[in-house]
């Protein structure tokens, strides 16, 4: 799934209990802390004038390691539970955008392009899903986001 969609799903599903911006942030955390770090390093690396990620791009090993860590339901749920029990339950609710990101990713990433290791480090299970750029998946995603925000808008209007 694209990063913007993850942000919108995170905000729409988990941003209505007082932490809307945190839900946006946690919706993109898995991509931000894997590909985002790579992107920033390349911006500041003077030898590269362009930053493009494709199937043909040779990525450094740390990107794959960070992807495994940030795209694991095990890791995400540990963080959410620690925050829930020891810090702030409203923040923990917004943080649920992170595991939801993972749940959205694993059926829509192919084996060729970052299959999602949802049970890492316990099990290195990865699924060969349908590409999120497939028209049926892409338009269903957009339709789902529109429906979610219309629902939130109507529900908010009725309560005010």
Regions found by a protein language model. Give the residues of each.
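N-terminal membrane-targeting hydrophobic helices
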Residues: 1-160
């Amino acid at each position: 799934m694209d990063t913007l969609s993850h942000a919108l799903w995170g905000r729409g599903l988990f941003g209505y209990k007082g932490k809307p911006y945190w839900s946006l942030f946690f919706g993109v955390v898995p991509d931000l802390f894997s590909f985002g770090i790579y992107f920033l390093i390349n911006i500041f690396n003077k030898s590269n004038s362009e930053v493009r990620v494709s199937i043909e791009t040779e990525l450094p090993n740390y990107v794959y390691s960070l992807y495994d860590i940030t795209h694991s339901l095990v890791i995400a749920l540990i963080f959410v539970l620690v925050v829930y029990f020891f810090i702030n339950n409203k923040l923990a609710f917004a943080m649920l955008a992170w595991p939801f990101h993972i749940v959205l990713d694993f059926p829509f990433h192919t084996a060729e392009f970052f299959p999602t290791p949802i049970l890492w480090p316990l099990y290195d299970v990865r699924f060969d899903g349908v590409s999120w750029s497939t028209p049926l998946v892409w338009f269903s995603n957009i339709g789902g986001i529109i429906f979610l925000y219309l629902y939130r808008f109507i529900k908010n209007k009725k309560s005010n």
